[in-house]
Regions:
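Dinucleotide-binding Rossmann-like beta1-alpha1 core, especially the glycine-rich loop
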Residues: 2-81
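Extended charged low-complexity segments that act as oligomerization/scaffolding linkers
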Residues: 8, 12, 28, 196-198, ...
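Alpha-helix-centered segments that form part of catalytic cores
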Residues: 65-103
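Predominantly flavin-linked oxidoreductase catalytic cores and closely associated redox partners
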Residues: 91-245, 300
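Conserved FAD/dinucleotide-binding core of flavoprotein oxidoreductases
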Residues: 209-261, 281-295, 306-309, 313
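Single, function-defining residue in the core of a domain
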Residues: 244, 267-272
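Residue-level marker for buried hydrophobic side chains located in beta-strands
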Residues: 275-277
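C-terminal helical "tail/cap" subdomain of flavin- and related membrane-associated enzymes
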Residues: 305-325
Length: 325
């Protein structure tokens, strides 16, 4: 995300103000081993190592009194202290550590729309009702509910799991991976700080194991976002809702919840004919490591680097699909 902000030319401080953003420098995994409150960190930065990294070997040969994560990175300690990954202004103690951001995705979408339209992009808020095709199998135009006919040489399918272009019209197969990744639902909840939370914004994401999945806790500036990721084959929606309320505490009984349905897998071809899948229309891996953001970022960068400048996109589509599909 920091790379994308730099490419677009967005000031990180302005970004954080606009999208309710906070720092994210690690993921803290709680109750994944014994369920007794134990935890470990996946930090984003690590100590400089020699050409051969022997950190794991040294830790196994030690008395293991220090958690493994703390022997490879300073960030677990910084996270426990609730500190930012950026040194105080004017500090002489080095460069910032690696970090990302927590953000309100809807506010970020509004911000990107504002920037894009200011740079000449035309934005239509509409619904696609039909797709016209060329004889060669390429998409000719999309027709909208308001009566518009939008023609283009290249179409980007950002319609989520619906994949209105790639799946509904081009009939590109979806490669299902649910036999390996079982989770397919998330019960979501927002907890306002002012009423139900002490206002302590942690500089990391928390992933806590529950009976049939895990809960994300994402701290924003004004609220905490929770989501119980689980498999509908092993727990009902009502039971999952009760479990996330119990996890959060008595105040959660009065809070609204939502349900997100998702499928794990990828499109057999992320680039088919003159249609490129970006985001959920092309792939999704369960949200444990925020891979959805990474894959969307990668697809955008790949498309920019392999943008076709003539009618024959065979070579660039082949390379795009080797990476993305």
């Amino acid at each position: 995300i920091r790379h994308i902000l730099a490419v677009i030319g967005i000031d990180p401080l302005d970004f954080m103000k606009r999208v309710d953003g906070t720092f994210k420098q690690a993921i803290k995994y709680v109750n994944w081993l014994e369920g007794n409150g134990e935890y470990f960190y996946h930090a984003f930065d690590k100590f400089q190592v020699q050409p051969i990294d022997r950190a794991a070997l040294r830790w196994h040969m030690s008395d293991r009194s220090v958690p493994f994560g703390e022997t490879t990175s300073i960030q677990p300690v910084i996270c426990e202290l609730g500190r930012t990954p950026i040194p105080q202004r004017g500090s002489q103690f080095g460069e910032p550590l690696k970090f990302a951001f927590h953000m309100n995705a809807l506010k970020f979408a509004d911000m990107l729309c504002e920037i894009a339209t200011a740079r000449g992009v035309k934005h239509y808020l509409d619904h696609v009702t039909e797709v016209d095709m060329h004889d060669n199998g390429n998409i000719a135009a999309v027709l909208t509910k308001s009566g518009k006919r939008l023609e283009a040489d290249l179409f980007v399918d950002c319609t989520g799991f619906a994949a209105l272009l790639a799946e509904k019209k081009l009939e590109v197969d979806w490669v299902d991976c649910s036999q390996w990744l079982l989770c397919d639902r998330a019960i979501t909840m927002n907890v306002p700080y002012e009423h139900h939370y002490p206002g302590y914004v942690r500089p990391y994401t928390t992933a806590s194991a529950l009976s049939n999945g895990w809960v994300w806790e994402i701290p924003l500036q004004t609220r905490k976002a929770l989501g119980y990721v689980h498999s509908s084959a092993y727990i009902s929606e009502d039971d999952a809702r009760r479990e996330i309320r119990a996890f959060e505490g008595p105040h959660a009984e009065s809070l609204d919840t939502g349900t997100v349905h998702f499928k794990v897998g990828h499109r057999a071809k992320a680039w088919a004919h003159n249609c490129v899948c970006v985001g959920l229309s092309g792939n999704f891996i369960e949200p444990l490591e925020s891979t959805g953001l990474y894959l969307s970022d990668l697809a955008i960068v790949m498309l920019a680097d392999h943008f076709p400048f003539d009618d024959d996109s065979t070579a660039v589509a082949y390379r795009f699909n080797r990476v993305m599909a």
